[in-house]
Regions:
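Long, amphipathic, Lys/Arg-enriched alpha-helical "connector/arm" segment
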Residues: 39-67
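C-terminal catalytic core of Y-nucleophile DNA break-rejoin enzymes
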Residues: 41, 107-170
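Catalytic-site neighborhood detector that most strongly recognizes the C-terminal catalytic loop/helix
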Residues: 105-107, 142-145, 208-234
Length: 236
């Protein structure tokens, strides 16, 4: 049963069994007889630029804690990094209007500095916070951040239904966006909206910190209805 389980767990278990063999804890190689399926992913869901702007423009003066979550999340939507990299950022990462950082996840296989030009709205968000602080924002634990994102979207009426895969990865279900959003939604919002404008995986990867040729971009190649209409309108 161990080697037949599906999804990401299968990958981790195979790695663990390889490690046991290297450490000479076991010489049983029965796991090598089984294939390892790639994890199943659905089409990515993310905020449209209009939905992101609703958050940016929302009056949260009566809810200062949610206002901080909003600032972090919208800023995150404009830079597209992984949440672990976001939490490491300081003012020293900002140089001449660019955000510079080295993604921790890929630095061993591709040690490249990512440079992201900061959008005007991202710069305005930063102006609200102490330039002498240790970090860009007063971050909370990631779990708290994720819960705050969902509360924020619900508060602002971002309730569009999105299609996701269930926990087994085989059946699709419909959920309101505010029930399933997380810190990773900010990264997908950055990539998804860029991909609509310039469907060039390598160019976007240079901004998002993905490794060149990343399989993640396969998920963004489903052309939406608006892009289809634009293509048809180009036919004379």
């Amino acid at each position: 049963d161990l080697v037949r389980s599906r999804g990401l767990g299968d990958v981790y278990k195979r790695q663990f069994l390889h490690w046991c063999k290297r450490m000479k804890y076991s010489d049983n190689e029965v796991y090598a007889l089984y294939g390892c399926k790639e994890p199943t992913y659905g089409d990515p869901f993310y905020l449209t630029s209009e939905e992101r702007n609703v958050l940016y423009d929302a009056d949260l003066s009566e809810n200062p804690k949610l206002a901080v979550i909003r600032d972090i999340f919208v800023f995150h939507c404009y830079i597209g990094c992984r949440v672990g990299d976001l939490y490491r950022l300081t003012r020293e990462n900002i140089k001449d209007g660019f955000l510079e950082y080295m993604p921790q996840k890929t630095k061993k296989c591709q040690a490249k500095t990512v440079r992201v030009p900061l959008h005007e709205k991202a710069l305005k968000i930063l102006e609200r916070y102490d330039v002498n602080a240790d970090r860009l924002f007063p971050f909370k634990p990631i779990h708290t951040y994720n819960l705050g994102i969902r509360e924020l979207l619900k508060y602002c009426g971002i309730d569009r239904m999105v299609t996701i895969l269930d926990t087994h990865g085989y059946n699709t279900v419909q959920k309101p966006l505010h029930e399933v959003a997380s810190s990773h939604t900010a990264r997908k919002t950055f990539v998804g909206n860029l991909y609509k404008q310039v469907p060039d995986p390598n160019l976007i990867a240079s901004l998002s910190g993905h490794v060149e040729g990343s399989r993640a971009f396969r998920r963004y190649r489903t052309i939406d209805d608006d892009m289809k209409r634009k293509l048809v309108e180009m036919i004379n």
